[in-house]
Curated annotation (Swiss-Prot):
It comes from Clostridium botulinum (strain Eklund 17B / Type B). The RecF protein is involved in DNA metabolism; it is required for DNA replication and normal SOS inducibility. RecF binds preferentially to single-stranded, linear DNA. It also seems to bind ATP. This is DNA replication and repair protein RecF. It comes from the Bacteria. The keyword Oxidoreductase does not apply. ATP binds at residues 30-37. Keywords: ATP-binding, Cytoplasm, DNA damage, DNA repair, DNA replication, DNA-binding, Nucleotide-binding, SOS response. GO terms for biological process: DNA replication; DNA synthesis involved in DNA repair; double-strand break repair; SOS response.
């Protein structure tokens, strides 16, 4: 799959942008704060109906305007897809795929797939479990609508369970009904996450080995607060029962997929706690490029690769690995110059100079 064309109107600092993209490498160069990342953000938004930089959609609208527009034409093996999104200042959005209105965000997932790699992705390793859960959830949602709908349902039931826990008129019988529903969704979520981690381990072993010239081994381990061998549902129900007193005191559900995490080990050392910044960056790179392989395995097409100002952050080995993988993958890169890229550009590649929200060449 690849993006054939992109159109932006009143999106951040772009009043009007219309571009035809290459199936291969597309490079947006320019000084900082000129609008390079805004192009990548708009593409990401069309895949997930949300920005990777802000939770406030109104931030995406040019400050002089009341609405912004994004339109993508995506080429796929079977059928081209046109995605049109209108973002309103009141927080609402209207999404159409091939002129058909999308009523639920989950219906958008999988229309086309992206993998983004940016300097902020170091947070996946360095910061809280919530960021690592978000990584897993976003990757799984774009390849499985069933995962998305189970996740939405789980969070809905979880919120309702927490309301019951805090209620003065606490009813244990009602709580047990919610527990059974919660366990059903959780069972699916955890099993899908475990399978995804297994796939990252499979592909990540080869990717990490190539980046480090065989000097390091990497392992990803899912960390669930629910210990089980075969019957996850039973184990989770027992945990909910055992934690009931504490959950009532705190007014929250203290265990479940919403509290899970995963650990990254390089040569049996916890990378979050003891890894160097270079090792942490390599771990993220391994995760992201494993996701490329996983999406290709499942959808039979490579996703679009978005590289947001990361090349300057990578040492020569990591940079060489990234640039050597660009064959057969539409890649959209932002950077301040193309010196590092010249050997990897061909006749199909396109380079766009960005200056204050305009393409100047």
């Amino acid at each position: 799959m690849y993006i054939k064309a992109i159109m932006l109107a009143n999106y951040r600092n772009y009043n009007n942008l219309e571009l035809n993209l290459s199936e291969g490498v597309n490079v947006f160069i320019g000084d900082n704060a000129q609008g390079k990342t805004n192009v990548l953000e708009s593409i990401y938004y069309c895949a997930f109906a949300k920005s990777h930089r802000t939770s406030r959609d109104k931030d995406l609208i040019n400050w002089k305007e009341n609405e912004a527009y994004i339109s993508l034409l995506v080429g796929k093996k079977r059928l081209d897809k046109r995605i049109d999104i209108k973002i309103l200042r009141d927080g609402k959005k209207a999404i159409k795929v091939n002129s058909i209105k999308i009523n639920k965000i989950g219906e958008l997932f999988g229309t086309f797939n992206v993998v983004m790699f940016s300097p902020e992705d170091l947070k996946i390793i360095k910061e809280s479990p919530g960021i690592r859960r978000k990584f897993l959830d976003m990757e799984l949602c774009q390849i499985s609508k069933k995962y998305y709908f189970n996740l939405v349902q789980y969070n809905k039931i979880l919120n309702e369970r927490n309301v019951i826990l805090r209620s003065r008129d606490f009813n244990k019988d009602i709580l047990e009904v919610y527990d059974l529903q919660l366990v059903e969704c959780a069972d699916y979520i955890v099993k899908e996450r475990l399978e995804y981690i297994d796939k990252i381990n499979y592909y990540g072993k080869f990717i990490h080995n190539e980046i480090t010239s065989g000097k390091e081994d990497i392992v990803f381990k899912y960390d669930s607060g629910i210990k089980f061998k075969d019957d996850f549902k039973y184990a989770f129900l027992e945990k909910l029962k055992n934690n009931l007193l504490r959950d009532r005191e705190q007014g929250i559900t203290s265990i479940g997929p919403h509290r899970d995490d995963f650990n990254v080990l390089i040569n049996n050392i916890d990378v979050k706690k003891f890894g160097s910044q270079g090792q942490q960056r390599t771990a993220v790179l391994t995760m992201k490029f494993s996701s490329l392989k996983i999406i290709k395995e499942i959808t039979k097409e490579y996703p679009i690769l978005l590289l947001d100002d990361v090349l300057s952050e990578l040492d020569i080995n990591r940079k060489r690995y990234v640039l050597s993988t660009l064959n057969d993958i539409q890649t959209i890169i932002t950077c301040t110059g193309i010196n590092d890229l010249e050997d990897y550009l061909d006749d199909k590649s396109k380079v766009f100079k960005v200056c204050n929200g305009e393409i100047v060449n």
